[in-house]
Each structure stands twice: as structure tokens, then as C-alpha cells.
Amino acid sequence: MLVDTKAKIGVFSIALGAYLPQFPSLVPEFQSQYEAFKKTLPDTVEIVDGGMVTTKEQSQAAGDLFRAADVDLVFLQLLTYATSYNMLPAVKDLDVPVVLVNIQKLKALDYDHTDIATWLGEGYACGAVGEMVADLERYGKRHAVITGVVEGGDPGVQAEIEDWCRAAQVRRRFRDTNIAQIGRPYPGMMDLYIDESNLYRRMHLYTKQFDWEKMWAIADDITDEDAIRAKAQDILDTFDIEGGGSIEEVWEMAKYVVAFEKWVKDEKLGLIASHYDGFAQGKAGVLDSMLIPAFSMLIKQGTACAVEGDIKVAMAMSILKTISGTGQLAEMYSLDFNDDIAIIGHSGSGDADISDKKPTMKIVKVFHGKTGGGYLTQFYPYTGPVTYLAITQDGDGHFKFIAAEGVNEEGPILSFGDTNMRTRFTCGAREFVNRWSECGPTHHFAAATGRHIDTILKVAKIFNVPVDIVTR
């Protein structure tokens, strides 16, 4: 990624303090279990360690630590029964979900030979799960529960922990990076319009505004020929250029990509939304003609780039790229009623990681519906499971996610330079369009290879955003 971010995960464990002097063997047992649990978190996140909590004061200290670190998520390991006052001081001032980890050490107790200490230490993690959720509900806190076992390993538990960590990466990415808006949204596409202050309030994402005049000159100071040549080769390695291509032919494009990469790093940009509606002449025309492949090179490196100035779809692309490794701009493109297939795609920049074969680049005289002409890029999404995500708003500015899963199938696609794919939905193409549209999406959405609704639901819980699931 051009701009790296790392989720901050608050972690602590709780046990009833009254047990410890009664059964001293529980102290090393619980400490060992807690240390083992922390090792199950992936190294892609930063652990903010609140320690093992058995008193209200320790819980308050953990909460102070979590607030100071601005954690993106909290894992609470339940070691045995504990009262909720061990939990609430640590989380009452946080606005992130608390994931209750109810992992029992043993698959089952030896009923004939288990004493009280062994029961409390190795078979009683479930004792307070309901109590914790009851009080989290009363405090208006978002929550989830993971139940499983340590003995013999539990792949389901490990998968859930890693999935929550992936979801938490989105919050950190939105908080630690910015979105650049270059120009303004496409005139009249009112579904794309957005209040940037409300965006920052609800999604923690700050908008930096840029004028096209600055973009036209962005490459003027790029003189490192080795860097330009290397980027030109990177472009040739990424795309098959219609009619062939050479380093010399993509030199100017490579120069702009090098400049954009520096700009992204300097401004800490995780997302870009742009639209140009001026005269495509002179330097403006040069940049406009090569912007689509240039921004595709940024998407390849983790910076979501959306056309038509659509900030909301840039967020959807960034979410999918962060949780799945792919994030492609899309919209309803056509319907194949003969095969009951939805054709889904879009013109503009795309994600090379979603393409099953080398993407193509071709020159067109006009960008349909837009000013100027130049390079189009077409990507060829993998067949198999696919996830779609749209982000929309209600009349009060609250955000909503709309998600669907389908299957991309082999078959004929359009080949005039726009990315498009053939998606089959379990509900059928007609019903999919009806259901999807009734959810009130913007006309843009994002696509990712694989099935990711479960992770999207976690992202939504972290941001406290509702989700409409259209079909799975």
C-alpha cells in the first residue's frame, strides 16, 4: 500500500477477583490463557494490552489506555465467571464494538475427577456471557460473541478473530488517511452528492479538496528518469496495450503516476474521487487522456480511485480492497434476459487484482458522457463468487450499506474498453435489480472477488451503520 495503516485492537481479560485468593492456582492458569489468546491475533494489527482485570480500578485503567490509543475494536476474553463491573469501566466511554471471547480451555470436563478450581479455570468461560451482553445493551454498546474451545484447536474461532481484525482495519484506514476530491461530482448525479462535514462526523473520513490546475502541474518537477522508466515498465507489465506499447509511448503517463504516488504519500490519501468537466486541451487534455490507467496504478497499490467524483463509491471500493484485497468500481450495465444474467461493470480506472488475465488498455476518441478522449482500461474479473457493496444515505444523512453476493460466470462480454462481468444471483436477474434498487443505492457500487458479506456486517457494526442484504 502507498499509505499503510494498522488497526489498533484493545484486548483484556476478566475474572472474578474473589476466586483468586480462594484458589491461588487460578492466577498462573488465567495468565497463561490470556497470553495464549493474545497470540491468536494476527500481526497485521497493533495490540493495546489492557491486561487481566479482576477489579473495577484495573478496568478503569484499561479503559484509559484504550481511549488514549483510540482503539478500533475491543476483544474481551472471559476467563471464568466475572461480574460486569470488571468490564464496564473499560468500555463505557468507547464507541467501538466489544467482542466477547468465550473460549473454553477443555472440550469437556472430566465429570468424575474435576474439582472446583479446575472447573473455574478450565470450563467456566461461559458463565458471564449473558450478563455482559445485558449490560452492554443497557449502555448502548455494540457487541458480538465468539464461542469455541482451545483444546484441539478451533478454526472457526480463529477465522472469526481474524475477520474482526480485517473489519477493524477499515476504521483505522478511514481515520488515519484522507480522501481527495479533485473537481466536483458529475453534474446532475445528485445521488453522489455528499456533505463532507457529515462524512467526517459519521465515517471519520476527512476530505481534502484539490483543483485541477494543481493536478495538471503535478508532474512538472518529476525528473528522476530511473523512477519514470521503472514505472513505465510497471505499466507495461500491468496492461496489454492495444497495438503494442513501449516505454517511450507511456513515458508521460509514467511520469504522472510517479507524481501521483508522491502526492498520495504526502497527503496521506487512502481514497480519491475525481471528475473533470473542462476543456480537454493542452496540459489538461494530456492528463485527462491518461488519468484512467494512471489511477488504476494507484488502485493496484491500495488507494481507491473513483470516477465522476463519487466519494461514496470510493469508500465502498476502499472497504472491499481492505477486507478482501480487491475493490472494483461497478454499476448496473445491462441485463441478459436469455441467460438470466446481470451484466455489471463500468468505464474508468480499475483494480488489476480482480482481473483473471492481463488487463487491456486502448485509446478511444471520446469518453462517453464526458469531456475529451484517451486511454480506457478493461479488466476481466475472475469467475466464481463475487460480492457487491454500495454506500448510500437517507434524508437525514445517515449512511447505509447495501450488499449482495453472486457468482460470475463464463460467457460473452462487451469488449469496447469497459470492465464488465456476467453475474448470476440466486434470486434471478430481474428480482436482483428490483431488490437492489428498492434499497435506494447510488448508481455506483464496488465489486470484490469472493464472498465477504460476513465481514461487511462486521465493518457496519464498527461504524454503527445498517446493512441491507439483497441476496447471498
Could you describe each region identified by the protein language model?
Residues 296-415:
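C-terminal catalytic subdomain
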Residues 31-55, 142-148, 205-211:
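Short beta-strand elements in bilobed, periplasmic/extracellular small-molecule ligand-binding domains
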Residues 231-323:
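Long, internal scaffold/assembly segments composed of regular secondary structure
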